[in-house]
Every structure is written in C-alpha cells, then in structure tokens.
C-alpha cells in the first residue's frame, strides 16, 4: 500500500477504529430506552455523543429547559390536569423545539440525538390513558433535567 493510499483509507474511517466523531453524530436514543429506570443513562449517552464538538451554550440549554419546567410545574401541582391539556402543552413545546432547530444546527443535533420531538409526539398517542399521558410527560421532564445535568457535568459552554 502506498503512502497516499493509507492516508485516504484513514479518512474513510478504515483502520484506527474508524471516525468515532461520525458515530457520535449518528447516535440517537431509541424511545423504548427512555424509561423511568434508564432515562438518566440515556441522557448521559446523548451528551457524551456531543463531546468533542461545540456543545450548546448553557444559556441555550437552559432556555430549552425553561419551556419544559412550566409543564413540569403544572404536572406536579395540579392533579386534575387533563390529558388533553398536557398534550396541548407538549405540542407547544414540540413546535418551539422545531423553531429552535431551524435557527441553530447545534440545537438540531442535540434535539435529534436526544429524540426529543419523537418523545413529545409519543405523549400524544391516542391509545394512552390520562394517567399514562401524565406519567409519560413527567418522564419527559425528568429526561430533560438529566440532559441539562449531564451537559453541565461534561463541561457545557457558558457562552
């Protein structure tokens, strides 16, 4: 093998374990893995998949969490909150995530890797009972909190 050939092979991900950065960019949490016992581990994997790249700024990830915090407060304070109201709030959050994804590629990568939009869509599943809708929405809120925590733990930007 000639000198140039070996160089181009490495660029294609051959030898030396391939291009791990591309593997991280392609990592996406599967919805079935986000459970009440595994959501913290999944959040850590998402943030690790963004290591070595520009993470979101702390301000950006906190603004995303602020959207979710309002829902979290409602869910914890109001036992009579209807499934329909929860679904409406999740739809609004989903729309705001889509908007932020359109504005900034780093947000789009984060939302995609964390599978946030599909998670929010799953709350709107017509087959769920009122109790299941509330439980799934609470799990979403906890998952978002875990993402923010690991973002900080792994050195999220303060810019």
PLM regions and their residue ranges:
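Small/polar/charged residue-enriched interaction surfaces, especially the RNA/DNA-contacting tracks
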Residues: 1-159
């Amino acid at each position: 093998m000639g000198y140039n050939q070996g160089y181009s092979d490495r660029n294609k991900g051959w030898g030396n374990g391939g291009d791990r950065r591309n593997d991280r960019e392609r990592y996406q949490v599967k919805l079935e893995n986000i459970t009440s016992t595994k959501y913290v581990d999944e959040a850590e994997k998402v943030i690790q998949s963004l290591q070595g790249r520009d993470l979101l700024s702390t301000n950006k990830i906190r603004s995303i969490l602020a959207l979710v915090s309002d829902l979290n407060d409602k869910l914890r304070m109001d036992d009579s909150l209807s499934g329909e109201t929860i679904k409406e709030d999740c739809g609004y959050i989903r729309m705001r995530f889509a908007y932020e994804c359109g504005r900034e590629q780093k947000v789009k990568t984060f939302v995609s890797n964390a599978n946030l939009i599909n998670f929010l869509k799953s709350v709107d599943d017509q087959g769920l009972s009122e109790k299941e809708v509330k439980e799934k929405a609470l799990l979403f809120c906890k998952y978002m909190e875990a993402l923010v925590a690991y973002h900080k733990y792994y050195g999220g930007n303060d810019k």
